[in-house]
Amino acid sequence: MKIGFIGTGHITKSVIHGILGSKLKIRRIIVSKRNNKISSSLKRKSKKILVLNNNQKIINNSNWIFLSVTPEVGHKILPELKFKKNQTIISFISTIKMKDLKKYTNMKSKIFRAIPLPPISIRKGPIPLYPPNKSVKKFFDHLGTTVEIQNENLSLNFWSTSSMMAPFYELLNTLSIWLYQKGISKSDAQKYITSLFIALSEDAKINSKNDLKSLVQNSQTPKGLNEQAVNELRKSGFYKSLNKTTNSILKRLKK
């Protein structure tokens, strides 16, 4: 199978790295020359990579097409492109809905929306997919944990929570800087904080079939440090601000 990517940003790079490290049998991966730095690094990584300077040529030479541009660019370029009737189109574009994708591509079927995140490069993390499809799910199962969604409105909730990626990294950065300012070396501070949150996340995943509230309760002792920390953050409105922000993101997606 030959696959092509319209857009050569960080997500495209992450997805391709995941593909190259997986057991997927892909004969050719075609990318745009638009981001020369990323496309050149990808070409050096594998002989399967072909770099073209024309989006239409990418479409013409691919069985599956992945749309990985910003919404602004998508609205501009998609109506100008001609897709093949037998092509599978998978959009990573956050705010272009299915009705517009169908209009822009002049396709009524074989169009999907997926939400890959950068950890897909190491074949980790959830990949929400709408609508459900056996072949597309099988593809993404090689790259992470596919979560099939039954309707587009529900998928917007996953887009909203995926926006917590940068805030999560900012949390790690803030705590690492705090340790550094207390005299810990930068490398040790970052190693400690990232290792801590990896361990906490893995523990949460193992226990994800249970109510996550139990993890909150079990990580505290009466008058202990964790009890103090979670109570102070609650009083400051830290957790309520998460709900407020995800609601704000959801409102934007529904426009």
Functional labels for PLM-detected ranges:
Residues 1-53, 57, 178-181:
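NAD(P)+-binding Rossmann beta1-loop-alpha1 motif at the extreme N-terminus of oxidoreductases
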Residues 13, 17-21, 44, 79, ...:
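Short, well-ordered alpha-helices that flank and scaffold nucleotide-derived cofactor binding pockets
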Residues 100-110, 125-159, 163-207, 248-253:
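Internal alpha-helical scaffold of NAD(P)-dependent oxidoreductase catalytic cores
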Residues 29, 58, 74, 185-193, ...:
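Small-residue helix-packing motif on alpha-helices
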Residues 12, 39, 62, 74, ...:
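A general structural signal for well-ordered alpha-helical segments in protein cores
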Residues 194, 198-255:
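NAD(P)-dependent Rossmann-like dehydrogenase/reductase catalytic/cofactor-binding core
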Residues 15-17, 38, 49-129, 133:
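Rossmann-like NAD(P)(H) cofactor-binding subdomain of soluble oxidoreductases
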